[in-house]
Design a protein with these regions (language model features):
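Acyl-donor-binding surface of acyltransferase catalytic domains
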Residues: 1-45, 185-187
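Conserved active-site alpha-helix within GNAT-family acetyltransferase domains
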Residues: 1-13, 134, 138, 162-181, ...
Length: 188
């Protein structure tokens, strides 16, 4: 490979996956076990308080992404920086609860007016330690897809690390297919 000859080796591989058509429609269905409740961020703030919810959100995020170069190790400043965009909508952050314990979250992103053909994105979805291994990942992904489709999305995409086998399997099970493959090279 010419990159190896030039002294570069792949250091990160990122896949773009997408879902549309009948697969997208099918992916809007979800169900959580009894006692597990999905709340959008404003509703969670009303119920538990914004400071508490933000702290629990950060804990779940950092548990889910302890290994991730961009998404892990967040603090409140980093979360606020991420929310300080023109596309951020608090009601596009879905939080998953069992009593007052935050199990996970799904933050969706709109790339413009969904009803005018803009794409929706699975921006960040993660389960904290208390939510893992319980079969909640698929329904949590689908809950976000449901939100985007209800608002008019006809295509939803996401980025995923190529070596994140559990996430890849989960997204493929939902109906996502790989549409792009990005490779970051570093000089060796």
């Amino acid at each position: 490979h010419f990159t190896h000859h030039l002294g570069y080796t792949p250091s990160r591989e990122l896949l773009v996956m997408a879902i549309d058509g009948d697969s997208l429609t099918a992916a809007t269905a979800y169900q959580f076990p009894d006692g597990v409740e999905l709340l959008d961020l404003p509703t969670a703030y009303d119920r538990y308080g914004s400071e508490t919810v933000d702290q629990l959100w950060l804990e779940a995020n950092n548990q889910a992404f302890s290994w991730h170069p961009e998404q892990g190790g967040w603090d409140l400043d980093r979360l606020n920086q991420a929310r300080d965009t023109d596309w951020y909508r608090p009601d596009d952050v879905l939080t998953l609860w069992e009593n007052s314990k935050l199990l996970g979250f799904h933050w969706v992103k709109r790339h413009g007016d969904l009803r005018a053909g803009a794409k929706g994105e699975v921006y960040v979805v993660g389960l904290g330690d208390a939510g893992r291994g319980r079969g909640l990942g698929g329904p949590l992904v689908n809950a976000g897809i449901n939100r985007l489709v209800a608002e008019g999305a006809s295509l939803v995409f996401l980025y995923v690390e190529a070596d994140n086998e559990p996430a890849l399997r989960a997204y493929q099970d939902v109906g996502f297919v790989v549409v792009e493959h990005h490779v970051l090279y570093t000089q060796s």
